[in-house]
Swiss-Prot record:
The keyword Isomerase does not apply. GO terms for biological process: ATP synthesis coupled electron transport; electron transport coupled proton transport. It comes from Pisaster ochraceus. One of its GO terms (molecular function) is ubiquinone binding. The chain crosses the membrane at residues 26-46, 62-82, 100-120, 146-166, 194-214, 225-245, 260-280, 300-320, 353-373, 393-413, 438-458. This is NADH-ubiquinone oxidoreductase chain 4.
Amino acid sequence: MIYLFSLSLSAIFLPWIISNKLYRSISIINAFIITFFALNVLNNHFFSLWHNISLNFGIDNLSAPLIILSTWLIPISLLASINSTNPYTPNSQRTFISTIFFILLALLLTFSALELSLFFIAFESTLLPTLVLITRWGAQKERFQAGIYFIFYTLAGSLPLLIAIISLYNINSSLILPSIYLSTNILSFSSATLSIWWIFCFIAFIIKMPIYGFHLWLPKAHVEAPIAGSMILAAILLKLGGYGLARTTLIFFFISANYISFPLITFCIWGALITSIICIRQTDLKALIAYSSVGHMSMVAAGIFTLSPWGINGATTLMIAHGLISSSLFCLANILYERNNTRTLAITRGFKLITPLLSLWWIITCVTNLGLPPTPNLIGELLIISSVINWNISSFIIITSATVFGAIYSLLIFQNTNSSTFPSFISNIQPISSSEHILLFLHIFPLILIIINPSILLLT
């Protein structure tokens, strides 16, 4: 892991010491080298217990897939943003690349931190570079409003989390996760106090995911962010919330199991259903994809709150699968936007007549998003649905309805973008380049590997 930290840190400064002709290419190559080291270092570390790197850092089966996902998608996002950053000056492009690598370093620190104060610092350090991505390289003037929403919601959840961490230290005299899991000091407090304490812990994570009701910042941020920002935000940054939720839920296992699970799981599955219905009524392609992320992450939260092995396994699988598919959807949306300069679904249609091979990528991505067998999305959703139904059989109708509406809007995305006649007022459509096909293949290839060997994502 020290190699990953060192390479990510050096990559932040690398663009500034290379000539104007080579800095972008070398940065992308360096990103793929980081990916190679991540795959190599983490290959033998899929243990049910922590693999300690040091006293404050370690990886296990929950953090390792998310680290690999982060290092896999960073070079892809850099490749996808080449066209959108071409109009900017070389120094602006260097700043863009450095910002991306700073986010990667913060993600690696967050997913490998064993100590909660270090986890909090790394978790919050993703805020500023993400805000810079949205407000500096966004296309429309509304990006500033999106940035305000993003920072307001995130900071509103950060303060309760900080208070909870400080309180935990005063009680346990340690913030190292393995020692907290084994500690019995928490049992001396009343159930009401512990319930409030746990709410303070998880509110930052459900805002970061986000689940329905705490999601207003996400569609604005996705719509206004540049392509790299949308891909990283949907694929990785939202998973910070799920990861933190899984970690803190294990600390307060007995509290959440006895007192808080019922309202939280009910709220999450209703949120998944409502956002799936909202997606059907969307007219903006990027907003539709953003709302679909809210629905999927609401299901992830429901799976974690069941506190069952099936639920947590399903949540992990769905987070990884959603990370790849949501990034692919934003990449496809950007390919269309670069050719017709609009995200409106009423205008973005008929592309199968112009770019038939692109339609193949659309159908693969959409059917994977809806959970067609044997895709990892199906595995994750089935595990979550099974755990939720086992928790309460009356939740069957709600959670299955959410998946049905999810399938409907996924098919609507494909139908609206590829069917009907191509708009006559749009001309000079550029063919899909080889680099764009490679980008889309790099999203689908890991899913194929997971289909072949799904056990790599299972924690137990």
